[in-house]
């Protein structure tokens, strides 16, 4: 079944520039973002190259679902327009698109810029629990300083 956007959803799809889509679960965010990406990739005047995409989600499942939907929609467009080499190129470049979680995006950013960030190149991510003593210490310092 084809996605039928509401007026508000269509506005998000058509908005120029970067966009943040925030809405309740099941409201169509993934469908809106998928259509927005397809519109950008298939623009006849100034298409965005698929390998330049950055799509950030909160969960691995959401990132995988987003990539899968974009692939399916781009495949549909390629079947509709089999002679469009631009579409074929976009489909090929899609594997290089950065569609990931906020965590993995930030980790990659720090890894690529560890010197500028002033961290060791072999830094490790915390599981959260190991930071509890640090959090308590920082909280204590803040409370002592300001209260």
Model-predicted segments: where are they?
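ATP-hydrolysis module of ASCE/P-loop NTPase motor domains
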Residues: 91-98, 114-147
């Amino acid at each position: 079944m084809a996605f039928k956007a509401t007026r508000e959803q269509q506005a998000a799809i058509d908005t120029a520039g970067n966009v943040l889509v925030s809405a309740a679960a099941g409201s169509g965010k993934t469908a809106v973002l998928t259509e927005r990406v397809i519109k950008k990739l298939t623009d006849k005047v100034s298409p965005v190259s698929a390998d330049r995409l950055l799509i950030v989600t909160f969960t691995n499942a959401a990132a995988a679902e987003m990539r899968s939907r974009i692939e399916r929609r781009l495949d549909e467009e390629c079947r509709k327009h089999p002679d469009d080499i631009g579409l074929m190129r976009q489909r090929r470049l899609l594997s290089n698109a950065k569609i990931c979680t906020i965590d993995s995006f930030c980790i990659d950013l720090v890894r690529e810029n560890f010197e500028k960030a002033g961290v060791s190149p072999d830094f490790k991510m915390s599981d959260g629990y190991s930071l509890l003593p640090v959090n308590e210490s920082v909280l204590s310092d803040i409370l002592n300083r300001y209260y």
